[in-house]
């Protein structure tokens, strides 16, 4: 694999060159402004293209070395695509309110994540021994914790790089990253301060089409990093007979990007349960929401490899979900897309 390709025309069509009204500008962005049209600042895409490429390279390099990338975008038009892009590239995200101390007080955040796991396990087991009211309260607690921490519950520690949409809105996240020395790649609009951003990508941070394009490129760069990292380790996770086409958002011409629950039919080995792994089992904890206990449950059911999950058809998902009492987790947490990304990366290595 290689870094994803993009063109200045794509950026233009997505509206990446439109800044804010001239009177709302931040003077520190002056060098990135091409001019003014109808009192709107126009961003110099001749600078955006190499800056975005540099950010993509940083993401790929970080993931190739085993690092973690955290997507941060809590504004309405960014929330869904940030989550979808992080999931399909096996990375992490915050798309709800940023909790103070998410990075600088990771120990406390870890405690909340452990509580989420415990509540999840109780409810996954049917909440036996609990009253209807207690189950309802636990369900509400789970929803609240999932909204705040669902995108980072499997991160295992602070990330190695942040990718941020809208530096004004995500100032707290950027300050925490700066305090810990974590590099930040960010989309910086004409009303924002580029200081403290490691990889400044001057571009519109409000248009839905533009945000979808940025997140898609970053996700594909992360997948490239996975491929490079596995190639360096000489890993072979069980490649399909012919390479898979890389998954893209449903339609970059739309302001919203649809969540990909079940992707297109898989062009690899058919789904089957195994009596034993074929060679070394894959590290299924890399899938969102999968811990050691759930890995054991999957192994006991005959699931050891990414290719098995990648090959699941809707009826397979329904059957496994029902038998293991996963409560819709396979679709909700995007396991199939993540598994296909790992299989694709292994095939390209």
Curated annotation (Swiss-Prot):
Keywords carried by this UniProt record: Ribonucleoprotein, Ribosomal protein
Presence of keyword Cell division: no
GO biological process: translation
Keyword Ribonucleoprotein included in the entry's annotation: yes
PROSITE patterns registered for this protein in UniProt: RIBOSOMAL_S2_1 (PS00962), RIBOSOMAL_S2_2 (PS00963)
A single GO cellular-component term on record: cytosolic small ribosomal subunit
Single annotated GO MF: structural constituent of ribosome
Disulfide bonds: none
Gene3D superfamilies xref list: 5' to 3' exonuclease, C-terminal subdomain, Glucose-6-phosphate isomerase like protein, domain 1, Helix hairpin bin
Family (UniProt): Belongs to the universal ribosomal protein uS2 family.
Protein name: Small ribosomal subunit protein uS2
Organism field: Methylobacterium nodulans (strain LMG 21967 / CNCM I-2342 / ORS 2060)
């Amino acid at each position: 694999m290689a870094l994803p390709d993009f063109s200045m025309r794509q950026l233009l069509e997505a509206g990446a060159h439109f800044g804010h009204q001239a009177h709302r500008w931040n003077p520190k962005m002056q060098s990135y402004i091409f001019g003014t049209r109808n009192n709107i600042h126009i961003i110099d895409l001749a600078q955006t293209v190499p800056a975005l490429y540099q950010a993509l390279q940083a993401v790929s390099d970080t993931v190739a070395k085993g690092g973690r990338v955290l997507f941060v975008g809590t504004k309405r038009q960014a929330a869904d695509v940030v989550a979808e892009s992080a999931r399909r590239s096996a990375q992490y995200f915050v798309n709800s309110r940023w909790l103070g101390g998410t990075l600088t007080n990771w120990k406390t955040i870890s405690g909340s994540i452990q509580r989420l796991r415990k509540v999840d396990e109780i409810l996954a087991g049917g909440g036996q021994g609990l009253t209807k009211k207690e189950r309802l309260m636990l369900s509400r607690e789970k929803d609240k914790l999932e909204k705040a921490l669902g995108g980072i519950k499997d991160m295992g520690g602070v990330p190695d790089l942040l990718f941020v949409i809208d530096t004004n809105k995500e100032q707290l996240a950027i300050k925490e990253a700066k305090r810990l020395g974590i590099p930040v790649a960010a989309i910086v609009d004409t009303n924002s301060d580029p200081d403290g951003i490691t990889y400044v990508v001057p571009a519109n941070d409000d248009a839905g089409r533009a945000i979808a394009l940025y997140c898609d490129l970053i996700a594909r760069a992360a997948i490239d990093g996975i491929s490079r990292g596995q190639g360096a380790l000489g890993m072979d996770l069980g490649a399909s007979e012919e390479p898979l086409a890389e998954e893209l958002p449903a339609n970059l011409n739309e302001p919203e990007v649809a969540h990909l629950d079940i992707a297109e039919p898989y062009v690899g080995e058919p789904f089957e349960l195994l009596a034993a792994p074929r060679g070394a089992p894959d590290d299924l904890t890399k899938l969102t929401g999968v811990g050691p206990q759930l890995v054991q449950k999957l192994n006991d059911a005959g699931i050891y490899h990414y290719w098995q999950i990648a090959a699941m058809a809707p009826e397979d998902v329904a059957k496994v979900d029902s038998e293991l009492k996963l409560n819709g987790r396979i679709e909700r947490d995007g396991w199939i897309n993540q598994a296909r990304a790992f299989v694709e990366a292994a095939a390209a290595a």
